[in-house]
């Protein structure tokens, strides 16, 4: 998990 998309499971990895 990076930073922003932790709430969706870091699918995008942004």
Curated annotation (Swiss-Prot):
Inhibited by fructose 1,6-bisphosphate (FBP). The keyword Transmembrane helix does not apply. GO terms for biological process: glycerol catabolic process; glycerol metabolic process. Key enzyme in the regulation of glycerol uptake and metabolism. Catalyzes the phosphorylation of glycerol to yield sn-glycerol 3-phosphate. It comes from the Bacteria. Its EC number is 2.7.1.30. One of its GO terms (molecular function) is ATP binding. Belongs to the FGGY kinase family. It catalyses: glycerol + ATP = sn-glycerol 3-phosphate + ADP + H(+). Keywords: ATP-binding, Glycerol metabolism, Kinase, Nucleotide-binding, Transferase. This is Glycerol kinase. Pathway: Polyol metabolism; glycerol degradation via glycerol kinase pathway; sn-glycerol 3-phosphate from glycerol: step 1/1.
């Amino acid at each position: 998990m990076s930073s922003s998309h932790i709430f969706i499971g870091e699918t995008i990895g942004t």
